[in-house]
Structures are given as structure tokens and as C-alpha cells.
Amino acid sequence: MVPTMIYSAILALSAFTPSVLAQTRSSGCGKQPSLTNGVHNINGREYILKVPDNYDKNKAHHLVFGLHWRGGNMWNIVDGQSVQPWYGLETRAQGSTIFVAPNGKNAGWANNGGEDIAFIDAIIKQVEGDLCVDQSSRFATGFSWGGGMSYSLACSRAKQFRAVSVLSGGVISGCDGGNDPIAYLGIHGINDGVLPFQGGVNLAQKFVKNNRCQQANVGTPQPGSHGSVRTDFKGCSKPVSFIAYDGGHDAAPLGVGSSLAPDATWKFFMAA
């Protein structure tokens, strides 16, 4: 009788314990939103918001942060010149996603004293308090210093973000914490002369360890092939993948018109 009672109690408790992967709707769900597309300000710092044209206040949306590179700004993420708009993710999202492009301080993400992490925390609070977001479906991506900031989020906000995609990043925005698992995609050019290729591999290896993946060598393409090689690590608690491509320090790997990074990032996010 006692084991049966214990089992029943466990079942009852489980009904009130949400799964880690279960959708958690933000407080903005069901509200008539006041935030609109365009530039918004939090304590003197700006970000660009892009809400889907067919926004439904009762539908929980993905939330994606697009982070700019050193010397860039939030407008570079949306103008479609150095990269496809929103790193090519908006067209793939097909109305399922709210996008945010924060503006770095002094055209970068030094994250002194964690100020850039705090800024992103504040954006999340503002956006999710007004719009309907699936809080288990937050993502970040960026190139160069934006990649470094995405890596920093993976380190310190692994429990708040579902996955990151780091394009040619480095440890340049810090790594506070850095012990929790998170789905991690790295994309890096084998001839990167700014943030070396091996450094990008090392970033991924941190999450190979955190996610308890089996160790494996990262594959690389032949120089001059204009190709790429993807390594998917095995046995991970959360997925870790790394794409090495034949190129340098490129905001858009293999060119602005290439689907390599946008396709890989979007599919990785949705499968994480």
C-alpha cells in the first residue's frame, strides 16, 4: 500500500512540475501590445525590434537576438548588406519569431562588469512583458564580437537561452559562469586572421565538456574548395555542432548570398 501511495504522490507532483523543454508563455501573452517595430530605448541604450507582420498576441513566439560585430551597429543586422537581414533568419522563421538587434556600447560588446548581459536581460524583460514569447525558446547569434557576446550569453545565461550560434567568435565579451549545458553551434573560417580558427574550436570544446559529449576531432575543408565540413558531436545532453568553412573572418560565411550559416543556424535552433 505504501509504495502505491508514494507512486501516486509522485504522479501528482509531476503534474505540477513543468518539463525543462516545456513551453513557458511570457506575461505579454494575451495583451494588446504597446511595443512596435523600430528603435526602443532602455536607460539610454537602444535596440531594434521586429515583430512578425501576422503577430498573434495569443501565440507564443520564438525570441532571437542578432548581435553586431566590432565597429558595427544594430542597423547592420537589419539592412541586408554585410549579412542577410537578421543573419538570414527572418525569412526562415516565417512569422514564428520576434527579432531583436541590440546596439553595442562604443560599437562593440566589451561587457564591462556584465553591463551588456544586464542590457540584454532588460530587453528580455521589456519585450516579454509586452509581447507573447515562448520563454523556453530564446536564441542568440552574432559575428565576430557579436559571436563573442553570443558565447558570453551561453556562459552566463545557459538556463535562459535555448541555443546560440557563434560566427567567428572569441572570448572577447567574457565568460561568467560557463559551466552549464546549452545547445551550441560554432561556425568559423579556417583562414580567419582576426579571431583564429583554433580559438573558435576551443569555444565549442567548452560546451562539448559541459554537455558531456564524446570528444571528437573537428573536420576541416580543403583550402580553396569554397566548401565546408560539419562536425556533430555525439552523446551530448544538448547538441553541439561545429562548421569549418573555407574562408576568413567573414560576417557571411561563403558570401552574403550563401545559405550556409542561415540554414545551419535556423535548423540548429529549431532542433535544439
UniProtKB/Swiss-Prot annotation:
**Major subcellular location class:** secreted
Per its record, the protein catalyses: feruloyl-polysaccharide + H2O = ferulate + polysaccharide
- Give a yes or no for keyword Transcription regulation in this entry: no
Cross-referenced InterPro entries: AB_hydrolase_fold, FaeB/C/D
This entry's Gene Ontology molecular function terms read: feruloyl esterase activity
Its localization reads: Secreted
- What do the Gene Ontology cellular component annotations say? extracellular region
> Per the UniProt record, which EC number(s) apply here?
3.1.1.73
Respond yes or no to whether keyword Phosphoprotein is given for this record. no
Listed disulfide bonds for this chain? none
Its signal peptide is: 1-22
Source taxon at top rank: Eukaryota
GO-annotated biological processes: xylan catabolic process
Keywords in alphabetical order, please.
Carbohydrate metabolism, Hydrolase, Polysaccharide degradation, Secreted, Serine esterase, Signal, Xylan degradation
Describe the task this protein carries out.
Involved in degradation of plant cell walls. Hydrolyzes the feruloyl-arabinose ester bond in arabinoxylans, and the feruloyl-galactose ester bond in pectin. Active against paranitrophenyl-acetate, methyl ferulate and wheat arabinoxylan.
Q: Which PANTHER family match?
A: FERULOYL ESTERASE C (PTHR38050:SF1), PTHR38050
Task: Tell me the protein family, please.
Answer: Belongs to the faeC family.
Q: Can you say what this protein is called?
A: Probable feruloyl esterase C
The gene it comes from is: faeC
